[in-house]
C-alpha cells in the first residue's frame, strides 16, 4: 500500500524516553563513535549498541565499531556472532527500550551522529537490489518502509533528512521514530552548531511489530487504510 501511494515514511505510534538523548551524548563523550561509510558523507559517524564481531572473538563487547554489514568489514554472515556491545554500559535505558520494543532477532542497532556542518550525500541503501519497472526516479528500487527504523533522539533546528528528488523532509522531532524506506534516494545536512543524534534499527520484525505498523498507519492515514491492506 505504501509503495503504491509513494509513502516513504511512517511515524511510529510509540513513545521514546527522553533519557535516550543523554545516553546518546554519553556515547559521544566516551568516544564510541567511528566514521561511517567513507565517501557517502562528511561528519557522519556511528556506534553499534547491538551488532556483531568475528566468531573467534571472546564476546561481542567490541562490536560497537563494526557499523556496516559484515561484508563491509570483510566478513560474512557465517563468520560473525551477534549480541550487545559494551556501549550498553553507558546506554542502559536505550537497551531496555529496545528489549521492550517489538522484536524477534535484532541485527545492527546503532547510534548515528551527524556533526555540526556535516552532510550525507544523496544515496540509497538497497544495494544489490533489482531496479523495478515503472519505478519513480527518486525511488528506483521500489523498497518498503519496513526496510529500517530511524529514531530521532536529538534533532537540532536547521537539520534535515529529505528525498533528493522532491526535497520532502522527514518530520523529525526529538524522541520520534519512523519506519523509513531507505531505497528512496535521500540526503541529509546538519546546518546547526549541535550534534544530531539518531538511532537506526535493523532486523527483528515479528507479528507484534506488524500490528504496531498497522496501528501507526491507521493513526496517520485513517482506519480505512486497514481495509485496503488486510
What do these predicted ranges mean?
Residues 151, 155-230:
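Catalytic core of Fe(II)/2-oxoglutarate
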Amino acid at each position: 500500500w505504501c509503495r503504491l501511494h509513494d509513502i516513504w515514511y511512517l511515524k511510529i505510534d510509540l513513545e521514546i524516553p527522553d533519557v535516550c538523548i543523554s545516553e546518546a551524548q554519553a556515547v559521544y563523550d566516551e568516544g564510541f563513535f567511528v566514521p561511517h561509510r567513507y565517501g557517502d558523507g562528511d561528519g557522519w559517524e556511528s556506534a553499534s549498541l547491538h551488532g556483531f564481531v568475528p566468531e573467534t572473538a571472546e564476546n561481542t563487547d567490541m562490536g560497537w565499531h563494526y557499523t556496516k554489514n559484515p561484508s563491509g568489514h570483510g566478513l560474512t554472515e557465517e563468520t560473525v556472532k551477534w549480541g550487545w556491545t559494551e556501549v550498553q554500559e553507558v546506554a542502559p535505558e536505550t537497551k531496555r527500550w529496545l528489549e521492550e520494543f517489538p522484536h524477534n532477532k535484532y541485527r545492527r542497532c546503532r547510534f548515528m551522529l551527524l556533526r555540526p556542518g556535516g552532510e550525507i550525500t544523496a544515496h540509497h541503501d538497497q544495494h544489490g537490489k533489482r531496479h523495478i519497472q515503472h519505478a519513480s526516479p527518486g525511488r528506483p528500487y521500489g523498497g518498503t518502509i519496513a526496510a529500517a527504523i530511524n529514531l530521532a533522539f536529538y534533532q537540532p533546528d536547521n537539520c534535515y533528512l529529505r528525498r533528493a528528488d522532491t526535497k520532502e523532509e522527514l518530520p523529525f522531532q526529538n524522541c520520534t521514530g519512523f519506519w523509513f524506506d531507505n531505497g528512496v534516494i535521500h540526503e541529509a545536512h546538519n546546518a546547526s552548531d549541535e550534534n544530531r543524534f539518531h538511532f537506526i534499527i535493523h532486523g527483528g520484525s515479528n507479528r507484534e511489530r506488524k500490528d504496531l505498523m498497522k496501528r501507526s498507519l491507521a493513526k496517520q492515514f485513517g482506519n480505512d487504510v486497514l481495509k485496503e491492506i488486510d
